[in-house]
Amino acid sequence: MLAIIVATMLVSAQQFIGVNLGYARPITQLNQPVVGQEKTLTPTPYNGFKVGLVYDATIVKGFGFSMGLNYTFAANSTDWKSEFASVYPQVSSRGYYHQIELPVDWQYKFEIAQRTWLILYTGPTLQYGLSLNEKGLRRDDKGNVTEYRDVNRYSLDKNDHLALKPLNVTWGIGAGFQYERYFLRGGYDFGLVNPYKSISFAGKDINTRGRFDQWQIKLGIYFWER
């Protein structure tokens, strides 16, 4: 019966299917296995892009939902800094982030002019990390650079203090604008789960804490409408 009701609502809904491309700023906020700092979350921002498909349906009087399938790539780097007391050697790191996302948002569209809407939305996103690679680089006083670490944090054993789970759930809130078949949407996603594989750091009486957040802004076009 419920399936029949849902199907009937979708048949009468205003529906769009399209594509979107935009800017993504994932942020890992993680604590470290250091006594006295176990409650401090250190943010590490990444900058990149996302691209994907989107389905949008307005069911009744502006209320509806939007869902999609996105791919996100982002990267970050740190400045060179001295590894020890002397100026050299210096160390730096590079990070690369690949992720698939399934957002499902409940939304309300305010029609401010003919086929022109302001949009408010909120909802969960299921994220699956394909890889989160971190490379450590070392530079000597002659400018020679060597790589001393290259790990995928999703593939590490849970006893490694860097090990993270690829599966994440966020809750987002945002706003948007649509004119005809063109749209702009932006918002912030708050991480809901601890991304560490273990509840505590191996060999230490310190619990792991953290979350994955994300800023995003997307431009898109609907190529199908009913």
PLM features: residue spans?
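Membrane-proximal, glycine/serine-rich, low-complexity loop/turn segments characteristic
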Residues: 14, 117-119, 123-129, 189
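Residues on the lipid-exposed face of transmembrane beta-strands in outer-membrane beta-barrel proteins
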Residues: 19-23, 49-57, 69-71, 102-108, ...
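Bacterial Sec-dependent N-terminal signal peptides
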Residues: 1-20, 116, 219, 223-225
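Extracellular/periplasm-exposed beta-strand and loop segments of Gram-negative cell-envelope proteins
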Residues: 27-46, 74-100, 129-172, 192-216
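Outer-membrane beta-barrel channels and translocator barrels
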Residues: 58-62, 111-115, 180-182, 224-226
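Helix-adjacent hinge/juxtasegments
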Residues: 93-99, 106-109, 114-115
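Start-of-domain marker
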Residues: 15-66, 72
